[in-house]
Amino acid sequence: MSDEQQIKNGIPIANQWYSHWLWIPTLYLTRGLPYVILLMTSLVFYNRMGLSNGAITLTTSWFFLPFILRPLLGRFVVGYKSKRFWIILAECVIALSLVGLALSVRLMDWFLWSVVSFMVIAIAAALHDVAIERLYNREALLLERPIFFGLRAVSYLLSIIVGMAIPITLAGNLEVINRTVRPAWATLFC
């Protein structure tokens, strides 16, 4: 066994410092996506669906509630299962909620179901955020954390491009091609 390997649960693992370069960017990219979907893309979505600015503000302000309650949600992450379990569960719930959002766009009561879908995304995003922070604090050694600060920030900013610029551009192009708003957004969220 070389000097660059450690034994974790009886399994030789390469030096953790090098493996951080693989999981930190993807983890922080996925950390920023729900924020962008909730706090930016939803505004454009509701605007294009014809809601007034007052209704959009009132509706989307409720999506902040799970983030305010993060300390309470953090108790679930610590108390039950592993952090990786919560990360994977939250990502699956977010993906299923986006599919539900895509299906709700074509319904008559689309507004109610879109709010429910966005709220489920908000709760899952808050749990996801807590689990990522706790996992990072546990896995990244204290001396190495300053090295990864820039990597985390760049990955988080890339999530804004991936989560807002690309989908909204795609939805706009689909609106022009189809000449209708609802099918464009339904296609986007699926």
Regions found by a protein language model. Give the residues of each.
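Symmetry-related core transmembrane helices of the 12-TM Major Facilitator Superfamily/SLC fold
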Residues: C92-A95, P183-C190
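Glycine-rich segments within core transmembrane alpha-helices of 12-TM secondary carriers
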Residues: F67-R70, P146-G172
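Helix-loop boundary and gating motifs at the non-cytosolic
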Residues: Q6-F67
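Hydrophobic core of transmembrane alpha-helices in multi-pass small-molecule transporters
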Residues: L29, S97, D109-H128
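Cytoplasmic helix-loop-helix junction between adjacent transmembrane helices
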Residues: I121-V154
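C-terminal ends and interior cores of transmembrane alpha-helices
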Residues: I88, C92-D109
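Transmembrane alpha-helix termini and helix-breaking/packing motifs in multi-pass membrane transporters
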Residues: R75, A102, I161-P183
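Transmembrane alpha-helical cores of Major Facilitator Superfamily
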Residues: L29, T60-L65, C92, G150-L158
